[in-house]
Amino acid sequence: MAVWHSANGKVYLPPSTPVARVQSTDEYIQRTNIYYHAFSDRLLTVGHPYFNVYNITGDKLEVPKVSGNQHRVFRLKLPDPNRFALADMSVYNPDKERLVWACRGLEIGRGQPLGVGSTGHPYFNKVKDTENSNAYITFSKDGQNTAFSKDDRLNTSFDPKQIQMFIVGCTPCIGEHWDKAVPCAKNDQQTGLCPPIELKNTYIEDGDMADIGFGNMNFKALQDSRSDVSLDIVNETCKYPDFLKMQNDIYGDACFFYARREQCYARHFFVRGGKTGDDIPGAQIDNGTYKNQFYIPGADGQAQKTIGNAMYFPTVSGSLVSSDAQLFNRPFWLQRAQGHNNGILWANQMFITVVDNTRNTNFSISVYNQAGPLKDVADYNAEQFREYQRHVEEYEISLILQLCKVPLKAEVLAQINAMNSSLLEDWQLGFVPTPDNPIQDTYRYIDSLATRCPDKNPPKEKEDPYKGLHFWDVDLTERLSLDLDQYSLGRKFLFQAGLQHTTVNGTKAVSYKGSNRGTKRKRKN
């Protein structure tokens, strides 16, 4: 007998209300054939490779920290194209359109020779090499699960993981790192227990340390021994770009495109000193439930009677540094960005996040600290010389910018307002100034006691949305040129795109080159 049964599977229905769709900038941005070349000065920075150097009282910074393993975040400020006095006023209609910049080309120049830098710690927590052990490391006489000795730290150095990377966008790059989390109220966090950790997202600022082989973590909050990593990150937070978050950003402003090259290998294998926080499951758990599951204890009288520490870790190496695998000093062209923003520089600014430790040489500077000339020294005495370390970096940035138009249509303005309402304020849409009165009151000594108080509410300046964040500000408001063929990146752009210079109504533009080939004749037999 056939009977009706309710369906066991799920039925998926379309949403009852239409879902808002974010348009790509290519759908409403109108590109012109006017290109500009922008370039920066030679950008130099000098400092100590491992830490900040302060005066004796510690209240004045004398030498900043400049490490090859730091992020360099350049904030490029561009001029407002709507304020340009264009020779050809037919380029756009200010009543119906606004002008914006689009990035079409980029070259990040790096000076200084290639070199490998080393980092380390004079009190590094490594007990012994565990790759080629020739004797079992015994514990001290304090009992089980104690440190190998009171102090096992050694002076150790190594080269970091090799990394070359840059991220281009119109907002700061989003980074990720692991940090200490707040424990639940019901869980009593006892002293000495491992705290909970969580993944956090923050902007990558200029000077933030990159991952050098120990992970992206807040070492200041999660390593109280101050001896598990090198000096340059022991009191820092190492960040790594959150590519997954930026790739799924609905607007795609943080990352138009990026280039990345990382490499490392485990050079040495060590074991930590100190008490073991998490014991290996054995006979001490549940009356022997896990006995002989992970190890079989040693016999009495043997060094293996007391199990050793299992806190293994490697020190990585970046290996060979070669000019054959360089991401810098070469042009990159943006044809299609990974997100909805295809290179449009909203708010007339651009963020370039760079990491490059292939030029990681640290200078050693020795200074004679005694009175008298150096030629009078008879015998070498190390106490008569002071040793200093410095690290230098050299950058130069070149851009190819394209002038674009934004139509002031309702659907376009609605999306821009949802994305960033401050853009519409900068464009002064709907602002109608009141007519000036023919007579204005102007006091000469407005700050004196004889006159009235000045205005208590002066007009507020526009607040920086990234106030409190540290970037390397580069002003390009007066560094633009229409003569692309006068610059290296401009000539490369004209050549690779098959373009040539033209002049229309006094405004320089570029156009595609036409073919000069004649019609091929058919050969007679």
Curated annotation (Swiss-Prot):
<keyword id="KW-1015">Disulfide bond</keyword>
<keyword id="KW-1164">Virus endocytosis by host</keyword>
<dbReference type="InterPro" id="IPR011222">
    <property type="entry name" value="dsDNA_vir_gr_I_capsid"/>
</dbReference>
<dbReference type="InterPro" id="IPR002210">
    <property type="entry name" value="Capsid_L1_Papillomavir"/>
</dbReference>
<keyword id="KW-1162">Viral penetration into host cytoplasm</keyword>
<keyword id="KW-1160">Virus entry into host cell</keyword>
<comment type="function">
    <text>Forms an icosahedral capsid with a T=7 symmetry and a 50 nm diameter. The capsid is composed of 72 pentamers linked to each other by disulfide bonds and associated with L2 proteins. Binds to heparan sulfate proteoglycans on cell surface of basal layer keratinocytes to provide initial virion attachment. This binding mediates a conformational change in the virus capsid that facilitates efficient infection. The virion enters the host cell via endocytosis. During virus trafficking, L1 protein dissociates from the viral DNA and the genomic DNA is released to the host nucleus.</text>
</comment>
<dbReference type="GO" id="GO:0005198">
    <property type="term" value="F:structural molecule activity"/>
</dbReference>
<keyword id="KW-1048">Host nucleus</keyword>
<dbReference type="GO" id="GO:0075509">
    <property type="term" value="P:endocytosis involved in viral entry into host cell"/>
</dbReference>
<dbReference type="GO" id="GO:0039620">
    <property type="term" value="C:T=7 icosahedral viral capsid"/>
</dbReference>
<keyword id="KW-0945">Host-virus interaction</keyword>
<keyword id="KW-0946">Virion</keyword>
<dbReference type="GO" id="GO:0042025">
    <property type="term" value="C:host cell nucleus"/>
</dbReference>
<comment type="similarity">
    <text>Belongs to the papillomaviridae L1 protein family.</text>
</comment>
<dbReference type="InterPro" id="IPR036973">
    <property type="entry name" value="Capsid_L1_sf_Papillomavir"/>
</dbReference>
<dbReference type="GO" id="GO:0019062">
    <property type="term" value="P:virion attachment to host cell"/>
</dbReference>
<keyword id="KW-0426">Late protein</keyword>
<keyword id="KW-0167">Capsid protein</keyword>
<keyword id="KW-1145">T=7 icosahedral capsid protein</keyword>
<keyword id="KW-1161">Viral attachment to host cell</keyword>
<comment type="subunit">
    <text>Self-assembles into homopentamers. The capsid has an icosahedral symmetry and consists of 72 capsomers, with each capsomer being a pentamer of L1. Interacts with the minor capsid protein L2; this interaction is necessary for viral genome encapsidation. Interacts with protein E2; this interaction enhances E2-dependent replication and transcription activation.</text>
</comment>
<dbReference type="Pfam" id="PF00500">
    <property type="entry name" value="Late_protein_L1"/>
</dbReference>
<protein>
    <recommendedName>
        <fullName>Major capsid protein L1</fullName>
    </recommendedName>
</protein>
